[in-house]
């Protein structure tokens, strides 16, 4: 469960960064 939560948070942050356009 912990791993899934961490992965989910990373994915969410990745999507936000992608939307902003910052690499």
From Swiss-Prot:
It is found in: Secreted. Expressed in skin glands. Keywords: Secreted. The keyword Protease does not apply. GO terms for cellular component: extracellular region. May act as an antimicrobial peptide. Belongs to the Frog skin active peptide (FSAP) family. Septenin subfamily. This is Septenin 2d. It comes from Osteopilus septentrionalis (Cuban treefrog).
